[in-house]
A protein has these predicted regions:
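Formylglycine-dependent sulfatase
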Residues: 1-150
Length: 150
């Protein structure tokens, strides 16, 4: 896996939460989240003096200690689910998740702008993040995970 550098069964993503079989529930490696047993690439890079930015779909854990801000990203604009509408905060036709959850820098966003389009918003956030901090001479790591491919 890109963010941890280890096999998915070591980082907790042996299966996505939605597809976890009954015999996998509670089994290490099948937590359905990027577990705390592994360090993330942004955590390591941040420790080496990098700026770290994350934009796009996360789908690796919604608990406060698992969101991008807690896993080494100093700035983020995140869709917490694995996909949904590209133009609004409407989720997939699923009664359990009728509305998407977006976060910015670890804080929930209550309403998206009326002209929201995911790819443009994600690209703009990365560009703004780099531009705002480019003068300090520090390197950066930017992780961009578009949802529009869904």
């Amino acid at each position: 896996m890109l963010l941890s550098g280890v096999d998915t069964h070591l980082n907790g993503l042996g299966n996505m939460t939605e597809w976890t079989a009954p015999n996998q529930k509670g089994v290490p490696g099948y937590e359905g989240t990027l577990n705390k047993r592994v360090a993330t690439l942004p955590q390591l890079l941040q420790g080496a003096g990098y700026h770290t930015y994350m934009v796009g779909k996360w789908h690796l854990g919604k608990q406060p200690d698992l969101i991008p801000a807690a896993r080494g990203f100093e700035r983020d604009f995140t869709l917490m689910q694995g996909g949904g509408s590209n133009w609004s905060d409407m989720g997939y036709p699923n009664p359990a998740h009728p509305q998407l959850t977006y976060m910015r820098n670890g804080q929930r966003i209550d309403k998206l702008p009326d002209d929201h389009f995911s790819s443009a918003a994600f690209s703009d956030f990365i560009i703004e993040s780099v531009d705002e901090q480019k003068g300090d001479g520090k390197p950066f790591f930017a992780y961009l995970s578009f949802q529009a491919v869904h």
